[in-house]
Amino acid sequence: MTASTSVAVGCAVGIPVGVGIIIAVCFWFNLQKRYKREEQDDRELERAIYDESGFVSFDNFGPLRDSKDEAALASSELKNPDHTSGSSEGSAHPEEKDGKSRDQEKPLGKKNSKYYVPAYRRKINLLQVRNNNYGNNARQKSVVDLPSINNSSNVSLSSSQRHITKRQISVYDQMVPVISDEGPKFFADPSSDTNTSNDQNKASMIELKHNTRQSSNENLIRKLQNQDFGSYYPRRASSSFLNGNISNASFHTRNSSITSVNKRDALEDVFATPKSAAQSQLPNTFDKDNEGIDADHSVKDSRSAITDKDKDIYKLQNNYDVGNIGEIAEEDQYENEFTNYSQSKREFIESLRPK
């Protein structure tokens, strides 16, 4: 009982597996044969491609013909009768030629259907077949239509020229157009084309280019002077009368004693903070019309005004001032009312004290 069961299971499993393995081996052998054929075809194609006479063009279909086609054409030429033969013999040749051409096309079609052929190889084969058919038809027409030997060469030449139209490359296909850069010369009147006019045109063009370049540079300078390059607070448009030492708000935002020594009567500093600007304007608050008043009264009034103002004005102290060289700088030299952290800290501490 157990033996019969094991035999049944072995047959049920082993027979299908064995048949499948045999079929797979057969397919594998067929595939290997196909790969070998394709490799051989590819080698032939590479040989034809790298051959100088094998390039595909409309003028050299002759080198692309196969040896079998050439042998068939040679045999057909040997079988052709003389041109002096009757019209009955010549009329029978087109049908025979058509039959032969069909017979030649059939094996090619069978070969394409039986074996795998790439698309570019199919195109080359079709071009070869068309060229062969066209040559056979041209020969048949020349044999049938020509009545005599004298007219045969002329008519065959004219028919071949009629059917085969080659495109001739002209000089204009290889010409590179070049246009001169000077506009007035290109559209100038030929009658007025003299040396003097050319010199005048050159001088006028040079002068025009120089003027345009100079005007563009001036406009650029004006735009750069009026632009605000990242200052902390909006400022007025800059003017050309400002001092050269004050270049930008990001570099000078303090009222230093070094710059204020030689600038008593200078214009308003647009880069200074409001508090420092008020301090710099203190010496200019005196009216010049009242210089005739007593010197003692004016000195006393100015001293009292300065002492009153100094209580409310916050002064930036740093090592860059002449007056406080020995002191240690406690504030940043680029501080203003927006970035004065020390003053804000002091105000905050004072606000915390009980009142």
From Swiss-Prot:
Q: Give the UniProt keywords, A-Z.
A: Cell membrane, Cell wall biogenesis/degradation, Membrane, Phosphoprotein, Signal-anchor, Transmembrane, Transmembrane helix
Instruction: Report the residues modified as Phosphothreonine.
Output: 273
Q: Which residues form the signal peptide?
A: none
Phosphoserine-modified residues are 142
Key word Cell membrane present:
yes
Give its localization: Cell membrane; Bud membrane
Membrane topology, as annotated, equals: Single-pass type III membrane protein
Q: To which protein family does this belong?
A: Belongs to the SKG1 family.
Q: What is known about what this protein does? A: Plays a role in cell wall integrity. Affects the cell wall polymer composition in the growing region of the cell.
This chain belongs to the protein called: Suppressor of lethality of KEX2 GAS1 double null mutant protein 1
| Gene for this chain | SKG1
